[in-house]
Curated annotation (Swiss-Prot):
<feature type="signal peptide">
    <location>
        <begin position="1"/>
        <end position="21"/>
    </location>
</feature>
<dbReference type="GO" id="GO:0032366">
    <property type="term" value="P:intracellular sterol transport"/>
</dbReference>
<dbReference type="InterPro" id="IPR039670">
    <property type="entry name" value="NPC2-like"/>
</dbReference>
<dbReference type="InterPro" id="IPR033917">
    <property type="entry name" value="ML_PG-PI_TP"/>
</dbReference>
<keyword id="KW-0813">Transport</keyword>
<dbReference type="InterPro" id="IPR003172">
    <property type="entry name" value="ML_dom"/>
</dbReference>
<comment type="similarity">
    <text>Belongs to the NPC2 family.</text>
</comment>
<protein>
    <recommendedName>
        <fullName>Phosphatidylglycerol/phosphatidylinositol transfer protein</fullName>
    </recommendedName>
</protein>
<comment type="function">
    <text>Catalyzes the intermembrane transfer of phosphatidylglycerol and phosphatidylinositol.</text>
</comment>
<dbReference type="GO" id="GO:0032934">
    <property type="term" value="F:sterol binding"/>
</dbReference>
<dbReference type="GO" id="GO:0015918">
    <property type="term" value="P:sterol transport"/>
</dbReference>
<comment type="subunit">
    <text>Monomer.</text>
</comment>
<keyword id="KW-0445">Lipid transport</keyword>
<keyword id="KW-0732">Signal</keyword>
<dbReference type="Pfam" id="PF02221">
    <property type="entry name" value="E1_DerP2_DerF2"/>
</dbReference>
<feature type="propeptide">
    <location>
        <begin position="22"/>
        <end position="37"/>
    </location>
</feature>
<dbReference type="InterPro" id="IPR014756">
    <property type="entry name" value="Ig_E-set"/>
</dbReference>
Amino acid sequence: MKLISTAATLFVCLAPLSASARSISFFDSTQAPIQLETFPVKGDNPLVYCSDPSGNILQIESVDLVPNPPLPGQTLSINASGNLKERVEEGAYVALEVKYGLITLIKQTADLCEQIKNVDLECPLEKGEMTLTKQVDLPSHIPPGKYNVHADVYTKDGKKITCLDAHDIEFKIRP
């Protein structure tokens, strides 16, 4: 009984203070919340640039994924186009991180020239316009849930080719 009356007394004493505190502003009324600028990749895809892409070596014009979002057990069609501002040679690399919710599934650095062989390209990648069309058969046993992908791509000299994120790619249980 004593605990209840102490709590009630505390509430009664703090109620006027909390009522007056609502009218006190710790911030200038003209201040706005911080809004982070995002840089989505054009096309039907879940991709965003990690930061302003204007200084990147690869200027992506568009990326279209069909279906979007990708579905387990189905073929994913990728159509992409862009412009390389300079030649990309052997030694370029990609730092890749894939997460399932908060769990990191993959965190590795890989040779870009080895990886692009999977999409029928090879190094050196010459300066200029490029297109990519690829069909990828997705396994039917992708665990359901939300995935996040982060890829930083650099030349052999450490110059940024591009940096991309894909957030909340959701795979659902197929009926």
